[in-house]
Design a protein with these regions (language model features):
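Short, acidic, metal-binding catalytic loop of nucleotide-sugar glycosyltransferases
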Residues: 28-38
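Conserved donor NDP-sugar-binding/catalytic core segment of glycosyltransferases
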Residues: 102-131
Length: 320
């Protein structure tokens, strides 16, 4: 363990051996940061006891925390990573996110401000592969380069860094809030905290689109809806209203994305129009998840989402 106090902790969660290749590249992107001596990397390992260690985890800036394979969800693993972290700010990256040059330095600098959470620009690491470009627009269009610098209502999930003491105040609620980070961000803002986009914080995100990807969209969206309703104290009537309105989600979100691109990113409109069928299909999976999550709660969605990330359920593209 490094003797000096780190300025930034980065939590990455790893699962079964077949899912580790992308995370090894994620870890490498952190170990090649200019400010690596200021970083602590917390690898939360949720694989079986006989699984080989993540390549690169023997680096002096890396600390491994073992959790049981059985019964540990992605959100629980991330929350434990936050608790184990030693730096005042803690960020997350997953197996399809990679830090670009200067990422850590920019986060440390930005967090000198009054921000509870800081996010940055997201680049598409699988551009022109299959339907990755329309999915990129759907998920990260507002953080595409050049991302506007300034206070924000929402930051990119899985690529955001928080002040540790702020999110630890949520105690036993933290795992639930980390199931779907937009819920955590909404809760932070309701509690008077502020979020910030710094375009100097640059990361690459990979996108895979295949039938199993729809499973991940469904599972994450059900987690989002259930966590949103429960954490924000929604009444049964409000949950039913949102749940019964969920079939409108694909059209409403596609229309909002079209309007945003028309006004802010018109160069992306051809990609949107070509990819509209896959966007609607992905949002249909999300609509099913949100509708069920609002009305019936979490169900097995958190376990299913964990399987897509840690147990090899979702097929992954090869990233550069």
């Amino acid at each position: 363990m490094p003797p000096e106090q780190p300025e930034l902790s980065v939590v990455i969660v790893t699962g079964d051996p077949g899912t580790r290749r992308g995370l090894e590249k994620t870890l490498s992107s952190l170990l090649h940061q200019r400010s690596v001596e200021k970083i602590e990397i917390v690898v939360v390992d949720c694989a079986s006891a006989d699984a080989p260690p993540l390549s690169g985890s023997d680096h002096p800036r890396v600390r491994t925390v073992k959790l049981p394979r059985s019964g540990t969800t992605m959100a629980q693993a991330r929350a434990e990573g936050v608790r184990q972290a030693r730096a005042p700010i803690v960020g997350f990256l997953d197996e399809h996110s990679f830090a670009m040059a200067g990422w850590a330095e920019a986060l440390i600098k930005a967090h000198q401000g009054p921000w509870a959470g800081v996010g940055g620009e997201i680049y598409n690491g699988t551009s022109a592969r299959g339907f990755s470009d329309p999915i990129y627009l759907m998920g990260h269009s507002r953080w595409m380069p050049p991302a506007p610098r300034g206070e924000a209502e929402l930051l990119p999930s899985h690529d955001t860094c928080y002040k540790r003491e702020v999110i630890l105040q949520y105690g036993d609620q933290l795992p639930e809030l980390l199931m779907a980070e937009p819920v955590l961000m909404r809760r932070l803002r309701l509690d008077g905290h502020r979020l910030y986009v710094d375009p100097d914080v640059k990361s690459i995100h990979g996108y895979t689109v295949n039938p199993l990807t729809l499973v991940a969209f469904y599972a994450w969206s059900r987690c989002f809806a259930a966590s949103r309703a429960r954490s924000l104290g929604w009444s049964l009537g409000k949950r039913l209203l949102f749940g019964l309105s969920s079939p409108l989600i694909p059209l409403v979100r596609a229309a909002r994305l079209f309007q945003y691109l028309l006004l802010r990113r018109p160069v992306c409109l051809p990609t949107f129009l070509i990819g509209l069928p896959i966007i609607l299909l992905a949002q249909a999976g999300a609509a099913v998840g949100e509708g069920l999550g609002m009305i019936f709660g979490l169900g097995g969605a958190e376990v299913l989402f964990t399987q897509t990330h840690l147990r090899g359920l979702r097929l992954r593209a090869e990233y550069p």
